[in-house]
Amino acid sequence: MPKAFAPLTATFLSAFLALNLLAVTPANSWFDKGHRIVGLIAQAHLTVGARKEIERILPGGMTLADAAVWPDHEGRQIREFDPLHYVRIPELASGYDQARDCPESNCMVEALNWFSAAVADKNAPIMMRRLALRYVAHLVGDMHQPLHAGRAADRGGIDISVAYRGATTNLHYFWDANLVDLETGNEEEIAKRLTANLTAADRLKWQAGDPKQWTDESLMLVRSHAYNTGASGELSDDYVEKARPVVRRKLAQAAIRLAWLLNNALK
């Protein structure tokens, strides 16, 4: 197992494990929608062996979609885990560099590496594997939302106010949630529609890479699409229509990669 990131020390471990004992009632806040869609699609692409092991690791009745939203709710009780949901990369950098961007290993790239290894470790305590599985399911989704690899100066778009058709929010929230909410249907219907649009070539091509590569892909998209808001902060219909296919593709891509990662980890 790789070296643990800074927050995962003996000081906090007991608290992390205690969180696993909490009753989990998945919330319905709308930013959960994207994570649940990723979990639903990924669930359908698991091997029989991986599915059985996930059922053994997670508490009774919890699905991969439920696990994917857990870190944004019960997991938020541990503030030291907050930086694990993103990485901040300098505006002119060509890609993620751990020494520069994550020297303490407390960002989504290194956390996903560590949690993936923990899921795969059959000698690890079941409670640790449970915690790790929830974070793997969540962080793969975060990693495919471009602004989770956004600039430090605006906290990945959180400090950029935007408006669309009279409703104001921030740029990060707009990509996290509003764009997903524009899709018609409930989570299951959207997941089925995205799955139906997948090609065999997509599935094959996306089952590759690692967290660094996936983060670099998001970095390119955050520059080519997300930050092109215009000076006024009023998002145009053209901006939204260009962003929506990006969001659909990244949801599907995250799901296929999550399933691929778990299928390999749980062989």
Where are these regions (language model features)?
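N-terminal, motif-rich segments that launch catalysis or mediate targeting to/interaction with membranes
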Residues: 25-139, 146-267
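Bacterial N-terminal signal peptides
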Residues: 9-23
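N-terminal secretory signal peptides that target proteins for export/translocation
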Residues: 1-7
